[in-house]
Amino acid sequence: GFEAVIRDSFNLLPARILRPVAYQPKSAVNFSTASGSALTLLDMTGGNASRYGVPTDVIRFSNHTSGQFFSEFVYNTMKDVDGLLYSSRFTEALCVAVYDRTIPKLVSPGSPMYLTRRILAPVMAPWNVQVL
């Protein structure tokens, strides 16, 4: 997502500009779990990754290859797991990655929104990113 754009693309750059080509083909949607549904998430927050024996590269390295391999391993071997709960490397906020098998447990009250400058500019401002 855009966290990766800010975190990895703008490192050490004085001018942090998000151009339309980076966001115009994308959309966003709000969703929640359906009534009576709950997600089973593998909690990678705090020291859990270390307790599970997961290498730190999986959750902290800017090259996402290790994390993608780990997620694929979880997806293929832990069929009861709907996704991953992890801390953002950028903001330290909690993030959830959900797998496609989770879609039947999710509902969305609205249609996807195409990302626009009007939507993104206030969201990106705290990180000194100008949205064109």
Give residue spans per PLM region:
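Active-site and NAD+-binding cores of ADP-ribose-processing enzymes
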Residues: I6-L132
